[in-house]
Design a protein with these regions (language model features):
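A surface-exposed beta-strand-loop module
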Residues: 57, 64-125, 179-186
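Extended, low-hydrophobicity, Ser/Thr/Pro/Gly-biased non-transmembrane segments
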Residues: 1-15, 45, 108-200
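Short coil-to-beta strand junction motifs in C2/discoidin
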Residues: 61-66, 150-152
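Juxtacatalytic substrate-recognition/specificity segment
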Residues: 207-235
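Ligand-binding face of N-terminal immunoglobulin V-set domains in extracellular IgSF glycoproteins
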Residues: 43-64
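N-terminal, polar/Ser/Thr-rich
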Residues: 1-41
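Short structured motifs
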Residues: 25-33, 89-94, 138-143, 170-173
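Hydrophobic core residues within well-ordered beta-strands of beta-rich domains
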Residues: 40-44, 103
Length: 235
């Protein structure tokens, strides 16, 4: 059940004041969806620079369907809290980071992704045929930490059934970096943003030539016979 503020003009999270003297230099995510149960488990790491000489409270947007655990700064457990207030299917996770200049913030998360409008086109789904993880559903999203000089460079890894292909909604392509004995593969891609969108599915890929360009055209394998009969790749 979605408990987000019904006022769609609310922007409490979007208008948070950024912390002065705190920046994110890099982040990484390792996420493993369970396509049979419809759940997600993941770990996230944020390389933060704190030049204030004081403890700071970092805010992240989290999916309310997830449980947050094992929150650490430079390997030491730190206090955290998750707000009851929700906005656009996000709750606010607040974490106290130490006064040290270089801080590696790590955390674990897991549970059921939720969404505010399940009937909208392109809505989130998590199955062996298709999944879409957006922003906080993919990993907790920094809300009050500004990017470093290089932006928000991020490495995303996701482990899925071998039949699924990963398509990130960004400029880079995902590549397989490991194949496991349990019939899964780990994909990796680089991006540069605080959030992100990831699609994956049991896809068939066709190359289409158009205007001197080669375009990758993907469609679900269950539609392969229909698409081939219709000559979709030649259309």
């Amino acid at each position: 059940i979605d408990h987000s503020n019904p006022d769609l003009s609310a922007m409490t999270f979007l208008t948070m004041e950024p912390l002065e003297g705190v920046a994110c230099l890099r982040r990484s995510v390792q996420v493993t969806p369970d396509t049979r149960r419809g759940t997600v488990e993941g770990t996230a790491s944020y390389q933060l620079q704190n030049t204030t000489g004081q403890e700071q409270t970092v805010a992240l947007g989290v999916t309310p369907g997830y449980t947050i655990s094992n929150v650490r700064a430079n390997g030491v457990e730190v206090p955290f809290s998750v707000s009851d207030y929700q906005e656009y299917n996000e709750a606010k996770l607040e974490v106290a980071i130490p006064a040290e200049e270089q801080v590696e913030l790590t955390l674990e998360y897991g549970g059921f992704p939720q969404e505010s409008m399940p009937t909208m086109q392109g809505s989130k789904e998590l199955s062996g045929e298709y999944l879409c993880l957006e922003n906080a559903a993919l990993s907790p999203r920094l809300m009050n930490v500004m990017p470093g000089e290089d932006g928000y460079p991020a490495t995303i890894e996701i482990t899925l059934p071998a039949a699924m292909t990963v398509i990130p909604f960004c400029a880079s392509e995902a590549e397989v970096v490991a194949e496991h004995g349990d019939g899964t593969k780990t994909w990796r891609y680089e991006t540069n943003r605080a959030g992100g969108i990831l699609y994956a599915g049991d896809y068939v890929r066709e190359e289409i030539q158009a205007g001197g360009l080669t375009i990758d055209f993907y469609y679900g394998r269950k539609h392969q016979a229909v698409m081939e009969a219709a000559g979709a790749a030649e259309a």
